[in-house]
Amino acid sequence: MAARLAGLAVVLGFAARGPAPGGAAKMKVVEEPNTFGLNNPFLPQTSRLQPKRDPSPVSGPAHLSRLSGKCFSLVESTYKYELCPFHNVTQHEQTFRWNAYSGILGIWHEWEITNNTFRGMWMRDGDACQSRSRQSKVELTCGKSNRLAHVSEPSTCVYALTFETPLVCHPHSLLVYPTLPAALQQRWDQLEQDLVDELITAQGYEKSLRAIFEDAGYLKTSEPNEAAQQEGGTKGLRFETLESCQEAHKALSQEIKRLQGVLTQHGVPYGKPTETPSSEHWGPQVPTAGMAEPLRGDPGLRGDTL
């Protein structure tokens, strides 16, 4: 009873003091920071990224598959880059601004193969950047540990990443041939023999070799409008840089000279477009009796008469 009376006295004492002064305000205690805004830094970064598609299946050297499911980060300046091999590359601005940038720089797409060696991983179909999608190339280099060592942007919307790993230190760790199943290895062996026997041209060899890599899942099948399918892309785009266009032109010029040499060697007449009157270009062409069948350059097969 005494305790109840004491409590009642305390309550009456506070009530007697009257309301708080006009200048005072009640303080509201906030236990958690707000998470309003798409790019709020307190929001988990992965929850606000919307990829355009799923990544391609894991492929390539079997010993690299252990990198799948792992992520490696690097902070440069005010940005944090995160590489998840065989998944994607993301970029996050390290700031508390409400509109801090977070985006996808590419989703795992295919390998880059040069001289029959895995040279890099292409991450494509990232977030929109001007008139196209962001994309990244990941170069694998030998290192003491798995780590994302460097990130740069050599051209607009195209990023270059260097990933160090002890998994590629062996000189044969990135060779393509040993990773292929037996059936595709046999196709490659036959292709090499056909090239030696001059049953196919160099162009046909490269085309057939790419088909082997596509069947293995290392490269994606090229589509006519693949570049245009990227958001905001330009229709009919074939070369991303002037250097790649010049290299392709040089390779075609060399192939033309080589084929002209073969025709001359076998006595097959041919005319240069610059020396042929315009009327002959558009007029009907009547094949000459006994003339050897011309080379069929697209499939890369040579005529039997050669």
From Swiss-Prot:
This is N-acetylglucosamine-1-phosphotransferase subunit gamma. Residues 69-171 form the MRH domain. It comes from Bos taurus (Bovine). Residues 1-24 form the signal peptide. Residues 176-279 form the DMAP1-binding domain. Residues 38-63, 267-306 are annotated as: Disordered. Non-catalytic subunit of the N-acetylglucosamine-1-phosphotransferase complex, an enzyme that catalyzes the formation of mannose 6-phosphate (M6P) markers on high mannose type oligosaccharides in the Golgi apparatus. Binds and presents the high mannose glycans of the acceptor to the catalytic alpha and beta subunits (GNPTAB). Enhances the rate of N-acetylglucosamine-1-phosphate transfer to the oligosaccharides of acid hydrolase acceptors. It comes from the Eukaryota.
